[in-house]
Amino acid sequence: MAEKYENQEHQKPVGKMSAEEMGIFLEKGYTLRLACLKPNGDPFVVPCWHHWENKSECDRGSGCDCINGCFWVIPRSRSKWAEYLKNDPRCSWVIDDDQTMEKILCEGVAELVEESVVNGKWVGIAEKMAVRYLGPDGPTYLVPTLNQPRWLFRLRPTKLRSWQGVGWAKSYWVKETGGPSWKEAHNLA
């Protein structure tokens, strides 16, 4: 860990992100990977677009009353994972950048807001997603499919952890193994 990396993004301080850093990270177009449970108990993971509302947006009356903020996902009408979440709302998800090692890891529940509807609340959220993932012309991607029903889920994190920088969390470090200390390995000594 002592050497410097060419990509300066790797030089971020090792540790948790601040609320501001989390907000900046979540505004980027990284895919959310959602894990839910099939009816037989097997895990199922799906990549999906997401929209993040931070706690202050929730407090200002966005319709979300989550204490940690919330994530919105929009499955298509025939998506199996929408049924999985409807039947068992327990889920986990991660949003990460494998180049910079930034990540947000969550555990929580999925709240069904709309079940397979056309022209619901999901449209405005999908437009925000399309801009973030596809750029200013992103909403034009939605136009030919606006007549197709979709679900809307609010993912409510009960646990939310963040990480940035190349390095180990101190809690993983085993002391007295004969190598450098955690601080030495992370250039903090």
Per-region residue spans from a language model:
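Charged, gly/pro-rich active-site loop segments
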Residues: 1-17, 99-189
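Short, conserved active-site entrance elements at the starts or edges of catalytic domains
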Residues: 4-37, 42, 53, 186-189
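Catalytic cores of transferase enzymes with a strong primary signal for eukaryotic protein kinases
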Residues: 20-22, 69, 152
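Residues embedded in well-ordered secondary-structure elements
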Residues: 23, 39, 97-99, 144
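Alpha-helix boundary recognition
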Residues: 26-27, 86-87, 146
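Generic structural signal for secondary-structure transition and capping sites
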Residues: 30-31, 90, 134, 160
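Short, intrinsically disordered, mixed-charge
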Residues: 86-91, 127, 131
